[in-house]
A protein has these predicted regions:
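Residues at the starts of beta-strands that form the adenosine-phosphate
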Residues: 2, 25, 102, 122, ...
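Short phosphate-binding/catalytic loops that engage adenosine nucleotides
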Residues: 24, 43, 121, 176, ...
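NAD(P)-dependent Rossmann-like dehydrogenase/reductase catalytic/cofactor-binding core
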Residues: 211-330
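NAD(P)+-binding Rossmann beta1-loop-alpha1 motif at the extreme N-terminus of oxidoreductases
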Residues: 1-51
């Protein structure tokens, strides 16, 4: 198959490499420094067992890609940008690609698929459980072996079809665990709940993952989803995703941690914790924990702070102060 991977960060770069190694035609779209390194030296993919250098076509923008590909022969665009960048990336893509090209939203959060439906007719949700890292241009790491990760798929808003089954087979052949789900959105809501700890990890460091703040954020989310009538399913990924050190080093942190570490100027907390806050406000459910995590993460980005530089105790105190309480009229 022929794929365009839009958003060559950690997830997108590793996926592009694995697809290319399995014999598929892949074009990456990424940031300038990363693209330059891939062009000059190939993409270095470090895993627990080995290091591969994969030669891939890589460009920095859709306009350049348009001169290189026949969109009628592109089987799918895999969207791997962070959720805050989705709308802009899709608008640019829509200037060149046919609206019928399948869009695979291999992203955290639950808003990307609806955004894609505004411009493209065939949209698929992809649940992503792939422990990866991108800490320098031209080099990515994948920490799960022998299975690279889990990429479950389903048509959005729901349904199974032959194309989803075909993509799932391709992903399985490229080293991923992949199932086709009738209601992929339910599984992405389940993943959203687990991703609420991304902000905790980014703010307070990896040791805070799974702690009190993380559990409180997830408890809030479950209450909100119940009140909103939203069903969340939790995919059984732990049996397949076996996290191991790479070159003797553990994974430093998740995607939000990496955004702060690399000072990318953005973080997707608005579409993770912020999604719970939005739903809570719609349905009258207080969400002080997720609101504080959202506020603190955006503040740390604004001041150029480092990951792990915020005290978990200070965040808990801020929650108790009731920053997310609605104002009452006098």
């Amino acid at each position: 198959m022929r794929f365009v991977v839009l958003g060559a960060g950690a997830i997108g770069s590793v996926l592009g490499a694995r697809l290319a190694q399995a014999g598929h035609d892949v074009h990456l779209v990424g940031r300038r420094a990363h693209v330059d390194a891939i062009r000059a030296h190939g993409l270095r993919v470090q895993s627990p067992d080995r290091e591969d250098v994969v030669r891939l076509d890589a460009v920095t923008d859709i306009a350049t890609l348009d001169s290189l590909v026949d969109w009628a022969r592109v089987h799918a665009v895999v969207l791997c940008v962070k959720s805050q960048d989705t709308a802009g990336a899709l608008r640019e893509l829509a200037r060149y690609a046919d609206s019928r090209v399948p869009i695979l939203c291999a992203q955290n959060g639950v808003s990307n698929e609806d955004t894609a439906l505004r411009l493209f007719a065939n949209v698929y949700g992809v649940l992503v459980a792939c422990p990866t890292a991108f800490l320098e241009p031209g080099v990515v790491r994948t920490y799960s072996s022998p299975v690279t990760g889990v990429l479950d798929i389903g048509r959005h808003p729901r349904g199974r079809d032959a194309f989803a089954a075909q993509v799932s087979r391709v992903l399985s052949g490229a080293g991923y665990g992949s199932e086709v789900y009738e209601d992929i959105t339910a599984y992405k809501y389940g993943k959203l709940v687990t991703n609420l700890g991304n902000a905790v990890e980014a703010l307070c460091g990896p040791n805070a993952r799974g702690g009190n703040l993380d559990r409180l954020a997830m408890d809030e989310a479950r209450t909100v989803l119940f009140s909103a009538g939203i069903h969340a399913e939790f995919a059984p990924v732990s049996a397949l995703v076996q996290v191991r050190p790479v070159r003797g080093e553990r994974r430093p942190g998740g995607s939000s941690w990496q955004s702060l570490y690399r000072h990318t100027g953005g973080i997707e907390t608005d579409y993770l914790n912020g999604e719970i806050v939005r739903l809570g406000r719609l349905h009258g459910v207080p969400t002080p924990v997720n609101a504080e995590l959202q506020r603190a993460a955006n503040r740390l980005v604004a001041v150029g702070g480092e990951p792990g530089s915020v005290s978990e105790l200070d965040l808990l105190r801020a929650v108790v102060d009731g920053r997310d309480q609605p104002r009452r009229e006098a």
